[in-house]
Amino acid sequence: MATKRICVARIGAPHGVRGALKLWPFTEDPLAVLDYGPLTTQDGSRRFEVETAREAKDHLVATLKGVASRDDAVRLNGIELYIDRDQLPETDEGEYYHADLIGLAAVTAAGEPLGKVAAIHNFGAGDIIEIAPPSGPTLLLPFTNAVVPTVDLEGGRVVIEMPGEIEGDTPNHPEA
C-alpha cells in the first residue's frame, strides 16, 4: 500500500524581491513545517527545503532553498507541500488528524449509512464535521463527543448521533 501523503502547507504570493514568499501552514504549530525536512509536491516530483520562516499575521514569511528572486517565488504560488503521514507525531487518545478522518464512512448508532466524512472545519467556535451523503446536501455537525461518540479509524467509520433539531424535531418552545 502506498504511503499516505499529508498536505502541510501551501505556497502563496511572493514577499519582497529576494525570493521570500508567503507560506500558509495547515499544522497546529505553524513553524512545524521547519521540522519535517524537505517538503514535496503531492506526487513527490518536486522537493522544497524551508530555509527560514517567521510568523506574520495568519501566515509565514519563508525562504526556500534555491528560490532567490521574486520571479522564482511567483512561479511557485499555489503549490501545495506534502509530507508522508508517518512523519507526523502520534496523537493523544481522542485526538485525530483531519487527514485520518476524511473519507471515513459516517453511520448512525444503528449502523445506517449517512455518507462519508468530507472535511473537518473550524470557523472559530469549535470543530465541525462535514458529512457528504450519497445524494442531497452535506451535513455540518458539531464534532463533539455527544454527536460523534465513536471514531473507529481501523474500522474506517465514525458513528454519528444526530441532534434532534437536525432530524426535524419541532422546537421545545411555545409559539408566540
Curated annotation (Swiss-Prot):
GO CC, sorted alphabetically, is: cytoplasm; ribosome
> Boundaries of each PRC barrel domain copy?
93-166
MF term (GO), any: ribosome binding
Q: Where does the protein end up? A: Cytoplasm
Which positions carry the signal peptide feature in this UniProt record?
none
Q: What are the UniProt keywords, alphabetically?
A: Chaperone, Cytoplasm, Ribosome biogenesis, rRNA processing
GO biological process terms held by the UniProt record? ribosomal small subunit biogenesis; rRNA processing
Pfam annotation, one family: RimM
Residues annotated as coiled-coil are none
Q: Which family, according to the similarity comment?
A: Belongs to the RimM family.
- Record text about domains: The PRC barrel domain binds ribosomal protein uS19.
- Subunit composition and interactions: Binds ribosomal protein uS19.
What functional role does this protein have?
Answer: An accessory protein needed during the final step in the assembly of 30S ribosomal subunit, possibly for assembly of the head region. Essential for efficient processing of 16S rRNA. May be needed both before and after RbfA during the maturation of 16S rRNA. It has affinity for free ribosomal 30S subunits but not for 70S ribosomes.
The protein's name is Ribosome maturation factor RimM
